[in-house]
């Protein structure tokens, strides 16, 4: 009978389409859920879980049925079957390791999230309720506290100073509660470190004003500091600036000087994420007096005045300061120092970050991400933007009024996923000239230099040499100096003899008119001025940028909260739900959004729409500037082929050059490359990414929350030291900055990294850019602490130790950075731990402890080294019935795990008697306990236990010994243990047969043992004498079984070929043998796959010990194809076989097809043995053998056993790569390509092969 035949006979039931039955079933369940929800709702209903769809995995408290009712009452969805595309949250209290890997990247949440959200009356953040996270088993995520007190210190240098007049005790006591200040934390300013963004606590304004969707509008009054205002106190405290540098370094490491700091840390433990509120009143007053005709609001310090840098004027805020500032602001401005010229100044760090645009960009991204999260937490399900669209779209409402008057979407068609990418056009330029109509239509650039594009040449600087160095490094990929003569004769590298050079100020953004002339973002202003002498320079206006970015996100939030904050000028929005509700087309909705953004911000935005994030971004490229483009699904193939590979995310200069060397320039060229070839060239992850992206495939979801992986702070501008003490003091100051950032995020770090940029030997001492780092070498040192910390003194001490080991020339230092990794939460809340029901046993005295608790305690106490020395482990599995909650002890099986060296812990811990436990057995038992035999218990560990715990374990061992002697005299009935609870009539259950009497003495599963030739003699000799005797007896028994099996096989008729395998015969075998003989190869050995199919004793005897599936497969092969016998005869023939009496036909009249097998091998260990024998004994694989392996892999895909498929593929890859014959690598590529094609067609994805 061919596989799938039983399905084909049922094709005429109305669901001919593949997967149509399940799709219809799921749709019916969803409709049933909606109808039940309409009947269940009463006065206590709400829309807290609107847009949330849960899937319950396993036992939970509340139960799955209770959670279903809660989702009905509160506007959520409950999925009986998990869907990766539809299910938003998975609810579970415990998952096996295989499930954790399978659900990697999904939101696995504890049920307390639902219960506590209902209690709170709003949707809480799921991060504190995650069951597992990517970082570690103890990290639950970031927790932010929106409460702050006036006396708390600042979290970072970009915030306003602790004191207004540089006096410690001068603190404002009364803060008006009409406004709240948005937390403005710190993060690395490095543009490349986007994943290290840090979230900000978003506090709402409570003052009257226009709001959208419950969120205050920023135009009434600005209550959020943008962070560009520098503080009077930087990373160094005021008293540190008044003492000599030597005393400063020593004092900060001494215990006496840290008492006040410890007190301050203790007092601010619960309010780390807060920014200063002392200037709140003054900020509100100055904002109210803003001049509406200017883009900037006011200037708080002389830092915003024009200052000569590199021969050009540098300004942060355009125009003069407001003359109507309050007295408090004026006092603060006078107290603020000027721009520091040395890193030893007190406020150097804070001033650096306040002027760094890259720091502001990363800070705004974190702030906007938290803004979106706050919107989701406080959502009431009402969106003003949608209501406006519904009124515009008259006669095409998506809502259908049912007979009962309820509003529902039952009859609405299911829309395909639709992602919208919104990107502002030339963001910095558009904001800078929105109130300057004279500059519109002209080439404009945002930069710090507003001069002629030239700066005076400083003595010792050699700009031409640096230019040649970087050009050579980028274009040719060489890191060496292009011409050694340039180092010896610096003057020869000068472009000309003039006393001025081109300005090195970078262009942050340029208009499209400037881009048409060859100017690009990131270009030096001097070079851009040469290309376009009429280029107009516009200064930075951080306050205006932030205001427009906030307006952009508020506009999007009026339609939906499913937003991913990409940057201050860029966002991804999932508009699938909006289109379904409003019945608008994607183009109509995009046009409405663009018009509203333009009205609110006076800036234009481009919109791209696609079925996934990749296509939406590509569509935006075509839509720019000031346009929109909808990439329809039917247009994707033609559109994607013509796209350059550089348009794909993740493809930079290096990868572009590597692809060009392969003759690939477009995505169409890339589509001709197989995944195996791409993974070989670029690695498994990058190869798979390129394979999918070039076909327009992208399954990345719109993410609103991201976990923080590191905290860092780097400065590579203005770093010039003359003495070691200055460098040490700066490291301590940067450590204090790291402490503030860690405290602001509520995290501690364990791994510390110090990065130093040192001038390259021979490079000019004076850099081409004033204060820049020039040509440098990067040096890094890393240390891992015993415990995670956020203390500046501990971090600073570690930094100084690593710094001293570098033995650097202090004057050559050009950059310093500190990175903290391996983050853990500062406070672990015990209430967030998964709650589990207590398991107590009435069979033991002092029932407050269970056997599970005993082994969990012992497991926690064992070190890693001891775990590697353990040969056997006790597998304790407790399952509590949610109905009875009773504990029933069963007579245990002899439980010993195999000693195979290639059996890992994950395999061992999930097996029972060396075999996988049937799920049906576990589900019908209230409690099943396995404890090791008395010979396996460590007596020293047993004696260290508490008396009552030790007594419990001893009693269990005594019961085991008594039952093992009793089992020798009494055989189990039909292979089933008498301790199993009775079941209702008609229950289909596969039982594991009791071991034979000859096996009961040894307690070893002989099938699971490795070959005796594979046992390491040294390991065997190190085992206890009793265990050695058991293993020898087990091997003797297996040898006797093999002899008996061989004898019975020779006497019986030949077994017919497996009817499930329809493979080709060997092609031109004689010709290939002849070719081999000319080379002098040995005689061809018959394939082990054929030998295994016909001669394996373990597979031909249906009575052999093994798993139920093995018994079934052996029986089916022994009896012949099931179609040749009537079902009655088949049922009668199985009645005498242990463990097979329950094998019945299904209601459709078909026998269940056998499990996928490779020449009869079903279990993974048997498959591994067969593959190893095949690859190591055959030099040239036959085509039919390769096709047999391909069919086995595709059968695994059909049975949805992808975990075993992954193990088989990886094991074959390791074996075939070790072979010296190149034909094996070709065979593996052929197998993998076929498997990936089937996976792609079945699941829409491929297997990651590392």
Swiss-Prot record:
The alphabetical list of record keywords is: DNA damage, DNA repair, DNA synthesis, DNA-binding, Magnesium, Metal-binding, Nucleotidyltransferase, Nucleus, Transferase
Q: Polar residues: which segments have biased composition? A: 275-320, 1046-1055, 1131-1145
Q: Does the keyword Magnesium apply?
A: yes
Question: From which residue to which does any coiled coil extend?
Answer: none
Q: Which SMART domains does the record match to this protein?
A: BRCT
One GO CC term of this entry?
nucleus
Major enzyme class? transferase
Site location (Interaction with target DNA)? 769, 782
Region Protein interaction domain: start-end pairs: 1151-1250
Nuclear localization signal (motif): residue ranges: 1071-1077
For binding dCTP, which residues are annotated in this chain's numbering? 357, 423-427, 509-515, 521, 569
Q: Where is the UmuC domain?
A: 419-652
Q: Where is the BRCT domain?
A: 44-131
For binding Mg(2+) 1, which residues are annotated in this chain's numbering?
423, 569-570
Q: Which Gene3D superfamilies match?
A: 3.30.70.270, 3.40.1170.60, 5' to 3' exonuclease, C-terminal subdomain, 6.10.250.1490, 6.10.250.1630, BRCT domain, DNA polymerase, Y-family, little finger domain, DNA repair protein Rev1, C-terminal domain
**Entry EC number(s):** 2.7.7.-
The cellular location(s) given in this protein's UniProt record come to: Nucleus
**GO molecular function, a single term:** metal ion binding
Ranges annotated as biased composition (Basic residues): 1069-1078
Q: What is known of its domains?
A: The C-terminal domain is necessary for protein interactions.
**How does this chain assemble?**
Monomer. Interacts with the DNA polymerase zeta which is composed of REV3L and MAD2L2; the interaction with MAD2L2 is direct and requires that REV3L is in its closed conformation. Interacts with POLH, POLI and POLK. Interacts with FAAP20.
Q: Which family does it belong to?
A: Belongs to the DNA polymerase type-Y family.
- Designated name of the protein: DNA repair protein REV1
Q: Which organism is it from?
A: Pongo abelii (Sumatran orangutan)
Instruction: Tell me the name of the encoding gene.
Output: REV1
